[in-house]
Amino acid sequence: MSKRPLRWLTEQITLAGMRPPISPQLLINRPAMQPVDLTGKRILLTGASSGIGAAATKQFGLHRAVVVAVARRKDLLDAVADRITGDGGTAMSLPCDLSDMEAIDALVEDVEKRIGGIDILINNAGRSIRRPLAESLERWHDVERTMVLNYYAPLRLIRGLAPGMLERGDGHIINVATWGVLSEASPLFSVYNASKAALSAVSRIIETEWGSQGVHSTTLYYPLVATPMIAPTKAYDGLPALTAAEAAEWMVTAARTRPVRIAPRVAVAVNALDSIGPRWVNALMQRRNEQLNP
């Protein structure tokens, strides 16, 4: 053990809080009583070229799903698809700039022509901004770009692919959010959390409006995950984080069991506390911010 025992124990406790309850289906709507067989399921996953997305494509490939990998960089996407097909799976790489709504429409049309639609849509691509609110408001272009990628792009994909799911009477939309949405008070993430909160709201409404027609939704409230997206932020260096492979397992669990949400234990606890004592949560978040950003 290279780390000091106390530090190692502290990190393990922190990571335990980042993981979801053992049974994410407990006490929540469960439309799929038996795990869904992913064999042959057409899964479109955005942000598939690296991080959680790349790890998830590999796992879905092992489940014999038809993986449609989407991201901007064709070279990385091709490598992802080649790894899946090399293991005997089925995959295709479709480069797309998700900040371009017309490009998304063209992607949907291409997918419909190639394989006849999508059974499971996973809106994983995202842009994170860690910045004080006042600074974010001074850089309005970053606000707009974050909303476009984190909210408008997923909505546009849903707009294009959901009609086919509804027509077939079966479909699943998995939306990636962040644990900060559940506390509503995470400092330095005003723009990022707002974009993910908007997506989270739509995700829940999908279930209430379309669930009876066979189209379900799941929201994944990820904690800190060790991916290229957080690498530039020095404040995260050395902090406990899930691995991309662990985070990818959440996606597979969601696809197979269709829970309403999967969230870290600590985020669920803070969300419950927020409902009865929001000022306590505000004070907790403020103190945490002062500790991390003295």
From Swiss-Prot:
Induction: Expression is enhanced about 10-fold during nutrient starvation and hypoxia. It is found in: Host mitochondrion. Changing residue 7 to E: Localizes to host mitochondria. Defective in mitochondrial localization. Its EC number is 1.2.1.-. NADP(+) binds at residues 49-50, 52, 72, 97-98, 124, 192, 196, 225, 227. Pfam families: adh_short (PF00106). It catalyses: hexadecanal + NADP(+) + CoA = hexadecanoyl-CoA + NADPH + H(+). Changing residue 4 to E: Localizes to host mitochondria. Defective in mitochondrial localization. One of its GO terms (biological process) is lipid metabolic process. Keywords: Host mitochondrion, Lipid metabolism, NADP, Oxidoreductase, Virulence. The keyword Lipid metabolism applies. InterPro entries: NAD(P)-bd_dom_sf, SDR_fam. GO terms for cellular component: host cell mitochondrion; membrane. GO terms for molecular function: oxidoreductase activity. The active site is at residue 192. Gene3D superfamilies: NAD(P)-binding Rossmann-like Domain. Oxidoreductase that promotes the persistence of M.tuberculosis in host macrophages by reprogramming the fatty acid metabolism in host mitochondria. When localized in the host mitochondria, it potentially acts on unknown lipid substrates and converts them into products that directly or indirectly alter the lipid profile of the mitochondria. This change in lipid profile results in increased mitochondrial membrane fluidity, enhanced endogenous fatty acid oxidation and increased mitochondrial spare respiratory capacity. Belongs to the short-chain dehydrogenases/reductases (SDR) family. The N-terminal region contains a predicted mitochondrial targeting sequence (MTS), but this does not appear to be required for mitochondrial localization as deletion of the MTS has no impact on localization. This is Fatty acyl-CoA reductase Rv0547c.
